[in-house]
Amino acid sequence: MLDMITAGIIRNGSNYLQHHLRRNDYWAEGEQAVLGEWIGDGARAVGLEGSVTDAPFESLRCNRHPATGEELTALGAKKSVSFIDVQLSAPKDVSVLATVGGDERVRAAFAESVKVVLAEMERFAAVRERRGEAKHSESFRLTGNFAGALFLHDASRDLDPQLHAHAVLANATWDAGRRGWFALQPAEMLRASPYLRQVLYRELASRLRSLGYEPYGLNSKGFSVRGVEHLRERFSKRSRAVEKLAAEFTVEKGRQPTKREVEILVRESRPDKLTAVSTPEVRARQRAELSVGEAKQLDALVSKARAQLPRE
């Protein structure tokens, strides 16, 4: 199973908004762009709320204040990291319900759960301590804010259902102690990822229960949804491919890959985004992987959940 919370470094990102974030992992001419929204106290501090637009995103990429155009952090053009892309993924059963099952309420529940997790994650935003005795240390100090943009995608590049979020964080955080913007240090946020995963799973399972589904087996790796679990392997082609690469690595190196090495395997083996494939075509391909009986069973499960009164 792939890690449900990962982070990647974006060093330039000049095309990242248009070519990656605004597009799903497939794309067709005329396809509606994926809409994003601003997140974080840092975003609000520079006047960013609501829908993501191009100009302020570009300002953050270039280390500029979106309203004034002034340089944010002192490193300016020398700063090699533009963004930190934090990715949060839903358990496979949830992705199947939201996409193949067509229950938009599940997609909304995932989005709401992600926002709760990101609010928790923001508490761990930090800067490197560079004052006094700590001037030359590698210690961090929490700032509790970041400026980011949130985008939701719903498929892997193998076209498996894979509901996931990109929280793209600008490499800047406001340090109240020094009254200025400094480079964002993600180490504490990543160190908190086991806790944050549990927050995501608990929030999402609770919301699914209120929608009429039966999540069960909550643990550190996720949870299952009754009536969907038998379809999980069918739509896990990407996970199987990564597991195969990890097994080959183990045979070659005589040891299992580290988490960082798995992330590299994932990145280097990732296929290009598919072009000339529309959302209806993707849904049709996914539905075609189900037998007639499986499709009827999934539709009945979704209809039953929709018919139930919301649960507190």
Q: Whereabouts are the PLM-identified features?
A:
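Intrinsically disordered, flexible peripheral segments
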Residues: 1-312
